[in-house]
Amino acid sequence: MFFKVCQLGKGRCCQVLLNYASCQRCQLSSYKGTPRLIKAVQGSSKDQQLAGQVQRFGEDSWFVHSAPKSETMGVADGVGGWRQMGIDSGVFAKQLMTNCSKLSEQADYDGRNPRQLLIDGYHRLKEHATNVWGSSTACLVSLHRSDCTLHSANLGDSGFLVLRHGKVLHRSDEQLHVFNTPYQLSVPPTSQMHKVLSDQPEEAICTQLGLQQGDLVLVATDGLFDNVVESELVQQLQQLHGETRVEKVQLAANRLVDLAKRLSLRTDYQSPFALRAKANNMNYGAGGKPDDITVILASVEVSQRSN
């Protein structure tokens, strides 16, 4: 699973994509409030031996953090091919997310540069973690409270959706070298240094998007997106617009994970992964893709300020 690839066009993956909804950044002129995210996390481990670990679902890892200036959510999907070498890539993914979480807690972080979190978190891992090897994708999104703008940095095939009034406002782009080989951050053992695919955090695609009261933000690893089509995700979440009760958001996250897990085990289902495999002339046939699944679901609430 590990190989070197000529990384053509690396620079184009670093472009900043702007997507403002008619400059309605939470309509702060009328709300005059402070935005926050009502968040819920759920997931499922493909390998039950890896279940039950803190901030991990199998080889996936995640974090959420709230600060006065920002709220940040992140997921990382450890690359499973390392198991062939006796390495648990979930440890790498968890350390990467732990580093990013700690950096998001710093007083000067205001949510406007999650890619810098990823850069610094990755370099901390390389420089300070002992015998933490492996690789993972990563997706970070941060809410900049002062103007209710969502900033993102996505590397690989994890990703996020923003929904408004039951429609997809934005979906992140995935980065692949070839089919089923996503961009990934790596720290290999010395013996594998020149045999392992490794991209740079600076290559993460960055976007910024103005949010409004009631918008939904869905951050997930490919265990969700490879098994559930976008239209079904929209269907599952369309009644959640404007929901501010955390228990309702949690139930919706639970349903998404349950759905993805059921579909991943079906052999008669044309999953998004199966369709992409066919489009790439791969002999995958039909069926879902058993995988670790991590979902972070958030609803945007803007509290009213008293005059």
UniProtKB/Swiss-Prot annotation:
Residue ranges of domain PPM-type phosphatase in the record: 41-300
EC number of the protein: 3.1.3.16
Example of a GO biological process term: dephosphorylation
GO molecular function, one term: protein serine/threonine phosphatase activity
UniProt key word Coiled coil: no
Binding-site list for Mn(2+) 2: 77, 222
Residues reported in the UniProt entry to bind Mn(2+) 1: 77-78
GO cellular component: mitochondrion
The protein's enzyme class: hydrolase
Protein name, as recorded: Protein phosphatase PTC7 homolog fig
Organism classification: Eukaryota, Metazoa, Ecdysozoa, Arthropoda, Hexapoda
